[in-house]
């Protein structure tokens, strides 16, 4: 199972039912809607399509609303475009004017108060660089030197690297978009241009007013956000490393180190993190990724990201399906190369000690040591699954939850496969329900060793405090085990020694009432022994112990109830017999 999650931006190239289906089948876990573009009507159409297709495919796909944010842009230019030439001067006005090579205006009136002589102003993703030469507060104009030439079109982005701006946390448009998202029951809000914890709290205030349970992922895109990351994470549910504007606001050579640090801080707190922007950028035009892009995606996974994101590749590119498949294949390959033992050791040192984390560590270590097939997390809020995920176990994590909302929010968490299953509230019912659901997914089958973890008493969120090692399978009989071995073989029911004569016993488990000295030559050739006679001093127990053969004695009605030629597993340590293959210790 692929563990790294894939976020796809839905746009003109991918909004059809046919393409949404292809993206889901290719590996999309979360659909991102960019509210910098499009109307509410257009986005509602996309939401309806995503949910319709996901329901038809019986897949869980979450929806992420990405706000436009309090960005700074230029106003319109004369004839839609102007040419700025290196060496010339240009005036940036706080009053709206039609842009010319001599003067243009910006949407942020306080820019004049935030910059100072020597500050840099970057236009159109940093393609044009200006340096402040003079500030005229009376005229509300900033005179700049043009450091490199370029064409400037309408409404292009403006960045102020190293400058602390006084923009609001969210705009009125953002607030309207968030209320729309609440109405449409989206799962995540990616908040653009977050600089301070108060920016996140403004969004939370809107969510609390509407009693909406939507996770907030701030996008860190500037130096101020980087500087305040610890405080921002305290009030956030996760994080997006938005490398596009970040690479303009800070020197590009610093972005990889900042990415690693942001991911590490999220890993420490067990909060999901998305790495975004230009991951497979060339696939907007080409059907194959570059080697550098493949390395970029893999390194983000090695850094510890929960999810990787596609932007223009799926929103407007020529090869949206191929981009998702490429992302999936890179993720699977990178995960296969991970040293999960070292990863667990590193995470154990990184994450702070607490009661909940102690259970998480125990589950992860036990899963590694016993090589369990899956970890089944029964969870109301998703907290149990996230607790396990932070330790990056090699085993699959199956999150069984009664809530569709929780299942969708688990779609962003590394290694977690969410499954919706209603169930009763008692602890026994919860555990049985979790095991049955895990089997239904096809991820585990009879004979697999799994770990079940949950919080008890049931129904309370954030109380992960229980771990149980469980063997999936049908126990057909039990008695007193002799020795600590286990064996898998085909039964041969022998009411008398004559039933054993002339038989190849090399793959057989002998089932009989009792044995005497005439049975011994046959028993020592067999894989295992099951008898009805009781006691550790019985002939069956003594022979089994002397010959080193896994044996279970005292099994009631063994000859009657255990069929001939049945594949069974003997677990002598527990005195149990399972039908079929069972991965016993």
Curated annotation (Swiss-Prot):
Enzyme Commission code(s) on record: 2.7.1.40
Source superkingdom: Bacteria
Signal peptide residues on this chain, from the entry's feature table: none
MF terms (GO), sorted A to Z: ATP binding; kinase activity; magnesium ion binding; potassium ion binding; pyruvate kinase activity
UniProt: K(+) binding residues: 34, 36, 66-67
InterPro entries: PEP-util_enz_mobile_dom, Phosphohistidine_dom_sf, Pyr_Knase, Pyrv/PenolPyrv_kinase-like_dom, Pyrv_kinase-like_dom_sf, Pyrv_Knase-like_insert_dom_sf, Pyrv_Knase_brl, Pyrv_Knase_C
EC top class, as a word: transferase
Cofactor: Mg(2+); K(+)
Functional pathway: Carbohydrate degradation; glycolysis; pyruvate from D-glyceraldehyde 3-phosphate: step 5/5
Entry binding sites for Mg(2+): 221, 245
Transition state stabilizer, annotated site positions: 219
Residues binding ATP, per UniProt: 34-37, 73, 156
Keywords: ATP-binding, Glycolysis, Kinase, Magnesium, Metal-binding, Nucleotide-binding, Potassium, Pyruvate, Transferase
Reaction catalysed by this enzyme: pyruvate + ATP = phosphoenolpyruvate + ADP + H(+)
Keyword Aminoacyl-tRNA synthetase: no
Binding site for substrate: 32, 244-245, 277
Assigned protein family: Belongs to the pyruvate kinase family.
Name of the protein in its database record: Pyruvate kinase
Organism the protein comes from: Staphylococcus aureus (strain bovine RF122 / ET3-1)
